[in-house]
From Swiss-Prot:
Sequence similarity: Belongs to the TDA11 family.
Basic and acidic residues bias spans: 290-301, 403-421
Modified residues (Phosphothreonine): T236
Biased segments, Polar residues type: 257-287, 332-359, 368-377
The organism's taxonomic lineage, starting at the top: Eukaryota, Fungi, Dikarya, Ascomycota, Saccharomycotina
The protein's name in its UniProt record: Topoisomerase I damage affected protein 11
Broad class of where this protein is predominantly found: cytoplasm
Keyword Coiled coil among UniProt keywords: yes
Region called Disordered, residue ranges: 32-62, 252-306, 332-377, 400-475
Coiled coil: 179-231
Any one GO CC term of the record: cytoplasm
Keyword Iron: no
Modified residues (Phosphoserine): S244, S286
Keywords from the named record: Coiled coil, Cytoplasm, Phosphoprotein
Length: 475
């Protein structure tokens, strides 16, 4: 016996309490009093943690209640039919007195509870069973009745302690916590559902916007296809359309009206009115009129040559006009060195020779249709208007004509004779253009008297200006 066991036994004697018999089960047989064999942990499922010998020399064991396996047969409180279990004591205290002392040690501090709490929790005391009671607070009696009574008392004490704990957690205002928790969970679920619905609506909105943009793009493409089918000009290449904006804006009515006014004096005397009229007519043209005009042109004779097949010839004419004006401006003193009679006689003969040349080059020009001739004449009248606008001498021409009428009537009569010749020449030139002969247009002549007089006959304003300046120099 060591000092620790002696100290424990001395304290037990002083307190009149025997603690060495707790959780110890021995047989009452005198043969096995000192030599009882303890079962191993593998047989009953419990581990032995500590062994000590009491004052009487008997071996006792403290067992830790951590079962390795759950089995009803190995339960420590189960009664054995072949053995009678009693509490071993080493003192002279009787068994009832020891039981009363042990009950006083295991009774808990009980808080007074209401009858309602005891009625609401009847299953707590019954559900505890033998597993809810600590093994240290139970005592194995010598009979089955003593063990049952001890268990009943321990159950009542534990149920009272549990009831006291639950009574303290119940709120005093009468509101059920479970109902509050249930409502809280319901609200959280509703919020989650609302959030999910919002996200779904956002995704659906984005999808609808994408569908809208796609359908709008398809509608725009269909509109372009329909416009291309209705207006064939949109299908023509840009190269062919770049040379025809000026003539496309002139309707057929304006061309027929300009056909009768193709003479040079009318084009010189009314350049401003013609410019305004052509501008207004070009602004009033609508796409429907252009489409109707193209349909009429397509329905006409297929053998007739189109005017738009010669855009380079038209630009060649403009190039020659501009080149001639530049040469005339640079060589102004040379052209004014001679007398007016010589200057006026030369253009007459040159104009006659040029008219004969155009007649010889275009023998079958008069056999063309009148509509084509009117179109060509209107085109040449438009060219003369553009040239007059480029020169910018309309106002000076009006003043020069008035001064010439007052100073030199003889020169005026000669000029009228020259205008008649130039009118005949322009008519022949229009017929030559209708015939499609461009031999005279492809030849470029620089600083020749024939070219100079031919262009002077085509524009009366240039002749008036040259004559007026010649007389000023002679004075």
């Amino acid at each position: 016996m060591n000092k620790f066991d002696e100290f424990i036994e001395s304290n037990e004697k002083d307190l009149d309490v025997d603690t060495s018999t707790r959780n110890s089960i021995i047989s009452m047989s005198p043969v096995r009093k000192t030599g009882r064999k303890i079962r191993s942990a593998s047989s009953n499922g419990y581990r032995l943690e500590h062994h000590r010998t009491s004052s009487a020399g008997s071996m006792h064991s403290q067992r830790l209640m951590t079962p390795t396996r759950l089995n009803d047969q190995d339960h420590p409180l189960q009664a054995k039919p072949d053995a009678r279990r009693v509490v071993t004591r080493h003192s002279s205290v009787s068994v009832p007195n020891a039981m009363s002392k042990r009950r006083s040690l295991i009774q808990p501090m009980v808080v007074p509870t209401t009858p309602e709490s005891q009625n609401n929790l009847p299953s707590v005391s019954h559900s505890e069973g033998s597993y809810g009671i600590p093994l240290e607070s139970t005592t194995v009696l010598s009979s089955e009745q003593a063990m049952a009574s001890g268990l009943r008392r321990s159950r009542n004490g534990s149920s009272q302690s549990v009831n006291s704990m639950i009574a303290t957690t119940i709120p005093t205002n009468g509101v059920d916590v479970s109902a509050l928790l249930q409502s809280l969970a319901t609200k959280e679920l509703e919020l989650l559902e609302c959030k999910q619905k919002i996200e779904d609506l956002k995704k659906q909105t984005q999808h609808e916007e994408q569908n809208y943009t796609r359908r709008a793009r398809e509608l725009h493409e269909l509109k372009e296809q329909v416009s291309k089918h209705l207006d064939p000009s949109l299908n023509t290449p840009v190269k062919n359309r770049a040379f025809s904006p000026v003539y496309q804006n002139i309707p057929l009515e304006s061309r027929t009206e300009n056909a009768g006014n193709s003479s040079l004096p009318s084009s010189v005397s009314k350049p401003k009115n013609m410019g305004h009229q052509s501008t207004n007519q070009s602004r009033s043209v609508s796409p429907q009129d252009i489409q109707e005009r193209r349909q009429r042109d397509d329905s006409s004779d297929s053998s007739k040559q189109s005017l738009w097949s010669k855009p380079l010839a038209l630009f060649n004419q403009f190039d020659k006009i501009i080149q001639h004006e530049i040469e005339r401006t640079l060589n102004w003193d040379d052209s004014l060195s001679g007398t007016p009679e010589v200057q006026e006689g030369t253009p007459t003969s040159n104009s006659e020779s040029s008219a004969q040349q155009y007649d010889n080059e275009a023998p079958g020009a008069r056999q063309k249709s009148p509509s084509q001739g009117s179109v060509s004449r209107s085109l040449w009248s438009f060219v003369s208007d553009v040239k007059a606008g480029l020169l910018g001498i309309e106002e000076e021409n009006d003043n020069d004509v008035i001064t010439d009428n007052r100073c030199d009537p003889v020169y005026k009569s000669d000029r009228q004779h020259e205008q008649k010749k130039s009118t005949h020449k322009i008519t022949n030139r229009g017929q030559a253009e209708d015939s499609g002969d461009d031999s005279s247009l492809n030849t470029r002549k620089f600083k020749t008297t024939t070219k100079f007089q031919k262009d002077n006959a085509g524009n009366n304003s240039l002749t008036d200006e040259s004559g007026h300046r010649t007389r000023e120099k002679k004075k």
